[in-house]
């Protein structure tokens, strides 16, 4: 039986790992990448302990030649990429006068340029098969700019409209392109450590986003029949103001 391959770019310890596990539990061969691939060992052990198949790689998604080579190697040696998730983005907060060109450019590279490279390269293969799903992770900053978030908001807005343009171009060719707006705080150790009072307050009333529940929406998007595709969804806790 031909492998079902799910590619997760930005398989961090929280949402990226949850997405990887979700697809592995559904029978997908998971290929995951992050800048430091050694940090994928716990994820690999978890998936393989449950009988799943996992490949982990070190990759800087901003490096064009590396991304091109990486996608080609997956297609040639592991299997056809059925679904690709781009889950990379640098959330930084600086006032406009404190935002250096380096900070702005790096944020754009991570959130937007890397998304473009990944989307372009997987699309080349999906177009030949006339099928596939590409999902981009967005944020509150994708739809509105916040005080101190000029770099992050600019990059996330750009990613959102990259996704929309790709959806309009690739949809008629059988490729489902979706954008997920994460409009709320995710339940992570990082949030707990830095904002302990906030964490405890929200956690007690189910006001933090569970990475596993978010991940289920990515799988749902991928499994949608093509007569009823969703391009964009926004996910938030029930108490989040919007």
Residues of each region from the PLM?
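Substrate-binding pocket helix/loop in short-chain dehydrogenase/reductase
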Residues: 95-108
